[in-house]
Amino acid sequence: MTRLDNTRVIRPATGTELTAKSWLTEAPLRMLMNNLHPDVAERPEELVVYGGIGRAARDWESYDKIVETLRRLEDDETLLVQSGKPVGVFKTHPDAPRVLIANSNLVPRWATWEHFNELDRKGLAMYGQMTAGSWIYIGAQGIVQGTYETFVEMGRQHHGGDLAGKWLLTAGLGGMGGAQPLAAVMAGASCLAIECQPSRIEMRLRTGYLDKATERLDEALAWIAEANAAKAPVSVGLLGNAAELLPAMFAAGVRPDLLTDQTSAHDPINGYLPAGWTLDQWATAKEREPETVNRAARASMAVHVQAMLDFQAAGVPTVDYGNNIRQMALEEGVKNAFDFPGFVPAYIRPLFCRGIGPFRWAALSGDPEDIAKTDAKVKELIPDNPHLHHWLDMAAEKIKFQGLPARICWVGLGDRHRLGLAFNAMVASGELKAPVVIGRDHLDSGSVASPNRETEAMMDGSDAVSDWPLLNALLNTASGATWVSLHHGGGVGMGFSQHAGMVIVADGTEAAAKRLARVLWNDPASGVMRHADAGYEIAKACAREHGLDLPGIL
């Protein structure tokens, strides 16, 4: 089993020349490769895309076999991928998914990091995170609009809707957290983001998600103060450890206007540098003494969360951004770790009730002009949403594409299928140079059960019921998505979540149009169904408005 290969540089094909037998197999092939593009993945030489050890394939041997199989796969065959390893090709039919993926799934009693890590060391499993192992990660843009929407709502609730002259304190500039600085600036606030790995800061500077960086706290705070005085937001990366810096900042009287965290706290061994440790110490200990790292990281998280609680008690609006750090601190004895809320119940759930979530698409042509044309089409089809238009304008101006050109755009039931059909027509007419793939994050309305994140504090107490993502995956399979994935542990770590993903290809054919109409209606509708079942009136009203047939609910 080979997981490190420094000789590999993976980039997807672009243009209209196929390297597989059809666009339905070319698309997953290009998106798998895109996940490992050097401008996209965090550690592509190790197959790590983002989120600690979130991989695109189990090992390089498995990667090569997936590529080889996709290139020979017929349009009436389906490839099965088990935790990043291709295990079977079966005859199905043209409207069935071309790939079905299951990553990191464990029987609940054994769903722990300890058991998973043992399987991982033996080469029997792979951590797929959410979009790493499901081949639809598009770089930090994939989370930036959701982060922007969250920060805007925080500003509305806590600062009268105006974040000018305000600043956000956070930590973590990895594949998800790296979106925070740009999202904050887009929302009108400055951002001070602490990060312990220089390579991550450098990547965010290179891709335009971060304006400045320093190793000195005093310099970082001076830049923030200057920007706030001018009401000209700036994003600053500060090299350091959050578990050391947050308590020191609180003791020194520093008070941000907003506070959150996106360190990779979900994975104590691979994702969180213990306070007082160097990166070299950490790298060595992860291999030789993983339990020592685990204990030290968890102890540091307790200090980190206590500092966040101290800031909250001092009046700073504080929110958990879904990395399970509160749970880790609770287990370390911080009894009131959950005193600050998660971002979904605090800010996002009303959107989920209407099936609104992180809809995304990528241009297989590799031409940014295709994304510009689809942006214009979104504005044309949804003309009365100035907030959405503002987002698209900002994205076009500020977001640098990583790998294949792509766009994230939060839309919901009633709009997703219209956009998909319009994109398909643009491919058919030649307006777009090549097909597009349409997918989403697993963090969506009906595709995840995660009691410490997406389904935290459901009004009926159904936080941990994971039937819903299973039904979502089954429904998308039956509806004709091009590939469907079912994962465990994404975002919050082993034992704390189950979630499903789907991707569908718009290749300009009539057959694709029929699949798009089904999938892009049913997928968000299942989210409305889930929230209506939980008792949310917004979801029930949405279901009635769109004529959903929910016999046991309405």
From Swiss-Prot:
InterPro entries: Urocanase, Urocanase-like, Urocanase_C, Urocanase_central_sf, Urocanase_CS, Urocanase_N, Urocanase_Rossmann-like, Urocanase_sf. This is Urocanate hydratase. Binds 1 NAD(+) per subunit. Its main location: cytoplasm. It comes from Caulobacter sp. (strain K31). It is an enzyme of class 4 (lyase). It holds the Pfam family Urocanase. GO terms for biological process: L-histidine catabolic process to glutamate and formamide; L-histidine catabolic process to glutamate and formate. Belongs to the urocanase family.
